Amino acid sequence: MTTHNICALITEFPLVKRLIDLEEVVWFNPNITTLEEGLPYVGLGAANIKDASERLKRFAPYLMKAFPETAASNGIIESNVVEIDKMKSCLEAQYGTQILGRLMLKKDSHLPISGSIKARGGIYEVLTHAERLAIEAGLLNESDDYSKLFSEEFRQFFQQYSIAVSSTGNLGMSIGIMSAKLGFSVSVHMSSDAREWKKNKLRSHGVNVVEYEQDYGVAVEQGRKEAEKDPTCFFIDDENSQTLFLGYSVAGERLKQQFDDMGIIVDAEHPLFVYLPCGVGGGPGGVAFGLKMAFGDHVHCIFAEPTHSPCMLLGVHTGLHDDIAVQDLGIDNITAADGLAVGRASGFVGRAMERLLDGYYTITDERMYHHLGELSEQEDIRLEPSALAGMMGAVHVSQDQAYQARMQFSEDKMNNAIHLVWATGGGMVPEAEMSAYLAKSGR
């Protein structure tokens, strides 16, 4: 992008200058609409989520055998919701802001198998592909007990096929571990910001790790090219995959059930705010879609990105979506939040969900580390840096009177609110790595 074009973009969208200056920015989109009006742009609906949910139930007996850690939840990969009241008090004191309502944490950081939100979409897409291959070969029917897949016969069948994915880390972990367990030959193309321990964990599962000196965009491009050379290879495309998106979307109905069990009401008088860290957008986009389908217009989803990688905010705010990358503006896309180090957002997710997402904000690495240390100290919960991106959300909503007024959030409604921070990863971080994170946080 030329200097002239950047100047023109800034003239039309002054917020872009603040992104270029790496400022922490908050933007509540004035153009959001109702679920009824916004849903046609997604191109998916309740039937698609039901299909995904049913598929995951079919695979539950297999997952219980293949991953005994899922036995306690009967083969369903799901995470707890916990209240973080001490952290709430800490944020209120730190930012001089009263957060009305309750502050809670969704611990996708501690999902079984791969310890991140990517255990939802990544594992689901691998299972969908495996099911399709086995059914087409006449080895499986949807009415079968899927635990039969945990056998040498099926491992040998899947060994004929390969799977490839490009990742900054967590998606690669989920897809790599799941694919290898089924018997697939699997390659994970890792960008320069991927953590060494994630690569080592994948290798320990027999995964071929392909390393790049460049960022996520290059890893995707090269991964796709390599996969095209092999007719038996299935490339999982984090930027455009509707299957991944639907794997994440099942989280909505699951959370609704959890809230029902906890006696938590979400309606016009009891709003739900959900703060989701965003990289390329597939994970938070799919979860937000599922939440909208479960709670309708009473849930308000807000995406959080690093100041050095604000790709979704940039794409949606300018309307350029995947036609612009942060690097076009001289933003380096280098962040400690490795799962969020993406320069170009998913055009599919941006265009599908822009009318249904209340807002976006950016956060510095320093602040993520700071909150990492605070959460560990206050609540004894340890996360990786990117999982803390959502922690500022309740502060921003509480401070933005214009947003509250436009959305008609009265003080009574805000007192009834639930603020849910979606913790996206960190449950499997090695002790030495976590100690380094805590040292950087000053704790």
UniProtKB/Swiss-Prot annotation:
It comes from the Bacteria. It comes from Vibrio campbellii (strain ATCC BAA-1116). Its cofactor is pyridoxal 5'-phosphate. The gene is dsdA. The modification N6-(pyridoxal phosphate)lysine is found at K118. The lineage of its organism: Bacteria, Pseudomonadati, Pseudomonadota, Gammaproteobacteria, Vibrionales. This is Probable D-serine dehydratase. Its EC number is 4.3.1.18. The keyword Lyase applies. SUPFAM superfamilies: Tryptophan synthase beta subunit-like PLP-dependent enzymes. One of its GO terms (molecular function) is hydro-lyase activity. Belongs to the serine/threonine dehydratase family. DsdA subfamily. It catalyses: D-serine = pyruvate + NH4(+). Keywords: Lyase, Pyridoxal phosphate. GO terms for biological process: D-serine catabolic process; isoleucine biosynthetic process. It is an enzyme of class 4 (lyase). Transmembrane segments: none annotated.
